[in-house]
Amino acid sequence: MKEIISRHKAGEQIGICSVCSAHPLVIESALRFDLNSGNKVLIEATSNQVNQFGGYTGMKPADFRDFVYGIAQEVGFPRERLILGGDHLGPNCWQNEPADTAMEKSVELIKAYVAAGFSKIHLDASMSCADDPTPLDPMVVAKRAALLCQAAETTATDEQKRHLTYVIGTEVPVPGGEASAINAVHVTREQDAARTLQTHQAAFRALGLDEALNRVIAIVVQPGVEFDHTQIIHYQPQAAQALSAWIKETPMVYEAHSTDYQTRQAYRALVRDHYAILKVGPALTFALREAIFALAQMENELISPEQRSRVLEVIDEVMLNEPGYWKKYYRPTWSQAMVDIHFSLSDRIRYYWPHPRIRQSVEKLIANLNNVTLPLGLISQFMPVQFERLSEGVLTPTPHNLIIDKIQDVLRAYRFGCTPDVA
């Protein structure tokens, strides 16, 4: 990370896409995409996804590291080009507990991530706990972030400290996209970014963490990008010019969250304006979902009814029987909720792919289509971009390859934004 930031600060318009997903096909897509490019690949886990208690994936930080390393080994991707990051590390998971208890757990969370070899650490203590006022005083946020940083510094070996980097601050939207409809988004004011930096510097120095301040590479801000279930707010460079100008005077860059679904030109403009770390998550699993839905349509055309996977029906059954991951986010009317379940840009289907019934049905779908030849006309009908790539000779028409390539469509837009010489 330090090399990428140094090059950006030296005047190169380069950035890095942060892949925020625990889905094996998404991780495989990212590693295959940059297998021969020489680029570093940044893969991040969030605190609710992966923590010392297992998170919703059931993985602790060391488990997630081994999970990613296992995929890298299968792909042939060298570990030295992998950067592992932890996102929103702090009391996020324990906001309903008293602050002292939540912070004790947060310290252990940080230690577990650093001990497992994660080198990009987002110190985020911005959320109020059960006995806190709302919102938290910025100095309290900074002091808690400093305590988390201290835990990282005491855990890291000298070798790890060579690569260890920190991100401070938080964005306006909730982690994972907006829960309700959006009409506009508040762009972070430069004075608020400056205050974030100043309060963190003071809090770090109060704990003797002067050296650690040199490892702070980025501040999380809101440059004016967001999405909800049906809408996207696109980047408007003119609205963020003061914010962009301020960061030039520091040794840092910005990190932008919720950049999913922006245009490739927007990504290039964001990187130009020093939002050099671009987070993406739901857009990648949305592309995965599109690919599986497309393959299900092909299956309906090619496979006899009694042999089909019924993957779309299985998804509906599971999500309706177990609505915990979507009920409070989607519209209450039945017909509207079904549209959201299938097609919402926030893509809450992503929480259900590991479900045993859904996983088995996806495996059957892929097995069924592996046993037949996929007609080019059918691929053109349901995956037209992949049809073009087949015609160009850069893609072989297997179900697995079609899924991977569909996910990589998202990564192509980020590559355009993060790499100035890509046309």
Swiss-Prot record:
NCBIfam families: agaZ_gatZ (TIGR02810), PRK15052.1 (NF011626). One of its GO terms (biological process) is galactitol metabolic process. The gene is gatZ. Component of the tagatose-1,6-bisphosphate aldolase GatYZ that is required for full activity and stability of the Y subunit. Could have a chaperone-like function for the proper and stable folding of GatY. When expressed alone, GatZ does not show any aldolase activity. Is involved in the catabolism of galactitol. It comes from the Bacteria. Pathway: Carbohydrate metabolism; D-tagatose 6-phosphate degradation; D-glyceraldehyde 3-phosphate and glycerone phosphate from D-tagatose 6-phosphate: step 2/2. PANTHER family: D-TAGATOSE-1,6-BISPHOSPHATE ALDOLASE SUBUNIT GATZ, N-ACETYLGALACTOSAMINE PERMEASE II COMPONENT-RELATED. This is D-tagatose-1,6-bisphosphate aldolase subunit GatZ. Belongs to the GatZ/KbaZ family. GatZ subfamily.
